[in-house]
Amino acid sequence: MKLMDSTLLGRSRFSFFAAMPDSVTQAVSALYDAYPFPPEPMQDGPPPGYNWRWHYPSAYAFCTGRAPQLGRPRILDAGCGTGVSTDYLAHLNPSAEITAIDISAGTLAVAQERCQRSGVADRIHFQQLSLYDVAQLPGEFDQINCVGVLHHLEDPDRGLAALASKLAPGGILHIFVYAEIGRAEIRQMQEAIALLQGERRGDYRDGVAIGREIFSQLPANNRLRRREEERWALENQRDECFADMYVHPQEIDYNTETLRRWIEGSGLTFLGFSDRDRWQPDRLFGSSDTLRDRFQSLSKWQRYRLIELLDPEITHFEFFLGRSPLPQYDWSDNDQLLHAKPVRNECLYGWPSRDIFDPDYRPRTLSEAEYAFLEQCDRPLDSALTVAELLQTSSLDLAAVRQLIDQQLILLVPAQT
């Protein structure tokens, strides 16, 4: 039985089924039938809060700098699991046409029940389908969400190509895959559990039991045990999470170099990591001008690689890809900014109030002038005012407006050209 294979473009692979793609699909489906994932509880009514990556206007603005023109986007949740993301996508995009697919019938049933209880199931088309087979779906999609799925495929290149083929011109694709450096201890434990399971590999309940027994018996100062207790134990109290992490039959982990090559092979454009604060050098280099200057001399992907090497807490990559043509606005042109119409980002927790959480749930206290400006932006687009009109009655200047844009508190609609 083949446990580890590092030959796939330098990516770290964990699989027992390297030569049997159908077996991989069946094994992954069986895991999620046994342990539907993610195991978040259901609720009657909308899910709490938001994830701006699942709010099409916010995601599109992150990728392009402007709010989208589409009033009824088509959204695909590719590998929807138990429907947590699907539920948010439906509530955050009430005018969207949404399709959700997954290979696991058991997991898909949970997703349907979740969305039924929250009141949005009638707006979602659910279908049991492999990512490899998305060509069976009609039409193209303006936004595709694929979180925690591609790294569990036998052939991620084929999976990404399949998704790319369904992305409409100007469409955006959000992806979440594992990072190899931050998951080194996880890979070691995966292989240890598999060795002890032997021929019982594929009995996921046995794998969970063996894994928990290992952790309970390892010395308290053992590195694998410490990592589990310090980083993962809280979420891994749930067997579904423990199974997904330690007894998954198929996993491929990336580093920034293999990620770059994978993206380049897709024919899509890299639009940035959605957790952009993690990729800022200041949090690692402090006040060192020497390190900052050397950092600035590197290429974009060399910078990413350096940050990855210096921060072993990076356990995943989340990022957007897009299909051209995609507009790009940086709002550096004053005239262009003055004629644009700002609208308040709907992903602001605590609004209306001066004390809010921004789209990334960071606390933010608005000044009186900022609050007044956002109040004026909190109106339908057909009655929205331009930045120039708003500044006539505001003490803010263009620099302050640009700060609101950078913090994703407002989204901008360019003037008609």
Curated annotation (Swiss-Prot):
Q: Which domain of life is it from?
A: Bacteria
User: What family is it from?
Assistant: To M.tuberculosis Rv2067c.
Coiled-coil residue spans: none
A Pfam family per the record: Methyltransf_25
Q: What's this protein's name?
A: Uncharacterized protein syc1184_c
GO molecular-function annotation terms?
methyltransferase activity
InterPro entries referenced in this protein's UniProt entry, alphabetically: Methyltransf_25, SAM-dependent_MTases_sf
Record-linked SUPFAM superfamilies: S-adenosyl-L-methionine-dependent methyltransferases
